[in-house]
């Protein structure tokens, strides 16, 4: 193997030029792969690399998707994750046979899963088994987690939002990230690490830095990425975050092995026992859990709170529902399933403002023929989008936030599709099929618990003139991270005193 320090300048230059040439040829072949399909945001004739098209899509993704769908339900586009054949979610059923699709290759291409520092997506068969099984255990044991999660939410909100009866200003998204990171970590790593500021900062930063590093690598020719990732600042920063996490996890594991827990579940302890001495990377397992859960849940929670600020009348209806259901049933996972209006508000927020419109990324293993007759060739990078969420034929007034939308659906023929955690062809917020988000039941539980505490114990309102518009980056959409709200502890009504909420 030729090391950079041993190679002559000429050798390095020739290697780089060959790599760029191969990248150019590969890019042209990918462009030809979309021949016969309408396209938007194609590389300009004078653009040798895709970097400019990547940046355009990152800055104006929704506009390019709108322009593409105006041409056809299937079209080619250079995205910030590379060239994709975008397909309307109306055809999601045509992709239900996973044997025809390559999920792993899509993860490798989209998220650089085989680059050092990005391995949290895939770590071999043991790690995939561990992650699948630990999520199954968490889902199965949600009832036993409900009270501990409620206690942690109560304490964390007191720290984050304070218990002052006076209006206190907070920046919304950071406060939600801190809350969700702490509550999730109670189940993921247990006490006391779940409250360690260094751990909480690391798991929040990891996803942000990882996303920045992925986008940076997508700007580079694919053949140069195995070298360039060692030098790109976002990639170097990502490895520093992993190093910090590894130190914290190793210390926690050492303590766990000395004093095994007997009365409280944590995935860190469970996974260590499950591995039964087999070699595995506990740090990357935990970072994968954090990457999949913290930002998506915090994002949805922030969007819900702003939606409620804009429709304050809905808050009292939600508050009344929480009081009624908790008085009758107490804190149990099954109780949360009875909060049907709250469930509707969550699903409507996700429908109107999904964290990403690109919900289903695959490579085709074989030619796939859509129900409209369109044939997609083997080896095509496909992105099925959640555009059906804005289809007026499915959702009347789709651009309007209607917190009661899915509550009404429970009374009709489509009632089975109404629950927040239910996936289907008309709602792809949690993905679809075999690889639909397995952690959605835990996410729904912790978000509902957090909102119960907020509704019964706090009032909140937007700070006047605070920016809170929806912003986009590529396929992603999010509320302005500068959005600020004012919160204060509310005096409960007499009938609320009986509730077992701290």
Curated annotation (Swiss-Prot):
It is found in: Membrane. Cytochrome P450 monooxygenase; part of the gene cluster that mediates the biosynthesis of pyripyropene A, a specific human acyl-coenzyme A:cholesterol acyltransferase 2 inhibitor. The first step of the pathway is the synthesis of nicotinyl-CoA from nicotinic acid by the nicotinic acid-CoA ligase pyr1. Nicotinyl-CoA is then a substrate of polyketide synthase pyr2 to produce 4-hydroxy-6-(3-pyridinyl)-2H-pyran-2-one (HPPO) which is further prenylated by the polyprenyl transferase pyr6 to yield farnesyl-HPPO. The keyword Phosphoprotein does not apply. Its cofactor is heme. Its EC number is 1.-.-.-. Pyripyropene A and its derivatives have very unique characteristics of selectively inhibiting the acyl-coenzyme A:cholesterol acyltransferase 2 (ACAT2) isozyme. Therefore, pyripyropenes are expected to be developed as a new type of anti-atherosclerotic agent. Furthermore, pyripyropenes have been shown to exhibit anti-angiogenic activity against human umbilical vein endothelial cells. Finally, pyripyropene A also exhibits insecticidal properties. This is Cytochrome P450 monooxygenase pyr9. GO terms for cellular component: membrane. InterPro entries: Cyt_P450 (IPR001128), Cyt_P450_E_grp-IV (IPR002403), Cyt_P450_sf (IPR036396). The keyword Oxidoreductase applies. One of its GO terms (biological process) is terpenoid biosynthetic process. Heme binds at residue 437. The chain crosses the membrane at residues 5-25. Keywords: Glycoprotein, Heme, Iron, Membrane, Metal-binding, Monooxygenase, Oxidoreductase, Transmembrane, Transmembrane helix. PANTHER family: CYTOCHROME P450, P450, PUTATIVE (EUROFUNG)-RELATED. The gene is pyr9. GO terms for molecular function: heme binding; iron ion binding; monooxygenase activity; oxidoreductase activity, acting on paired donors, with incorporation or reduction of molecular oxygen.
């Amino acid at each position: 193997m030729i090391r950079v320090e041993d190679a002559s300048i000429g050798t390095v230059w020739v290697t780089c030029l060959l790599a760029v040439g191969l990248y150019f040829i590969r890019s042209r072949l990918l462009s030809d792969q979309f021949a016969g399909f309408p396209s938007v945001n194609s590389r300009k004739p004078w653009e040798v690399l895709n970097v400019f098209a990547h940046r355009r899509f990152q800055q104006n993704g929704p506009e390019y998707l709108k322009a593409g769908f105006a041409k056809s339900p299937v079209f080619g586009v250079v995205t910030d994750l590379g060239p994709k054949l975008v397909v309307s979610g109306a055809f999601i059923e045509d992709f239900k046979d996973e044997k025809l699709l390559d999920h792993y290759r899509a993860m490798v291409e989209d998220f650089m899963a085989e680059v050092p520092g990005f391995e949290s997506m895939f770590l071999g068969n043991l790690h995939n088994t561990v992650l699948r099984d630990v999520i199954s255990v968490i889902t199965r044991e949600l009832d036993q987690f409900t009270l501990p999660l409620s206690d942690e939410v109560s304490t964390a909100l007191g720290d984050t939002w304070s218990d002052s009866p006076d209006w206190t200003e907070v920046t919304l998204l950071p406060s939600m990230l801190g809350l969700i990171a702490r509550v999730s970590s109670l189940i993921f790593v247990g006490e006391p690490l779940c409250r360690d500021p260094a751990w909480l900062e690391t798991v929040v930063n990891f996803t942000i830095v990882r996303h920045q590093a992925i986008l940076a690598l997508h700007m580079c020719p694919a053949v140069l990425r195995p070298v360039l990732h060692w030098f790109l600042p976002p990639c170097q920063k990502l490895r520093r975050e992993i190093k910090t996490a590894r130190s914290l996890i190793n210390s926690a594991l050492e303590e766990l092995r000395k004093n095994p827990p007997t009365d409280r579940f944590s995935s860190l302890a469970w996974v260590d026992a499950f591995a039964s001495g087999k070699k595995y990377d506990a740090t990357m397992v935990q970072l994968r859990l954090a990457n999949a859960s913290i930002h998506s849940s915090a994002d949805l929670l922030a969007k819900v709170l702003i939606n409620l600020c804009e429709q304050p009348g809905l808050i009292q209806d939600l508050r009344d529902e929480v009081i009624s259901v908790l008085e009758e049933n107490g804190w149990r996972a099954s109780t949360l399933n009875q909060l049907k209006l709250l469930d509707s508000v969550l699903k409507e927020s996700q429908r109107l403002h999904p964290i990403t419109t690109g919900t289903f990324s695959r490579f085709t293993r074989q030619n796939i023929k859509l129900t409209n007759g369109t044939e997609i060739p083997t080896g095509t990078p496909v992105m099925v989008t959640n555009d059906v969420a804005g289809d007026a034929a499915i959702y009347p007034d789709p651009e309007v936030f209607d917190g009661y939308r899915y509550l009404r659906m429970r009374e009709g023929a489509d009632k089975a599709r109404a629950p927040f955690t239910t996936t289907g062809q008309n709602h792809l917020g949690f993905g679809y099929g075999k690889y639909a988000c397995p952690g959605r039941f835990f996410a729904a539980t912790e978000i509902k618990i957090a909102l119960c505490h907020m509704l019964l114990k706090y009032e909140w309102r937007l700070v006047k003139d605070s920016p809170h518009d929806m912003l986009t980056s590529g396929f992603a959409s999010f509320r302005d991270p500068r959005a600020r709200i004012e919160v204060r502890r509310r005096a409960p009504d007499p009938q609320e005193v009986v509730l077992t909420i701290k």
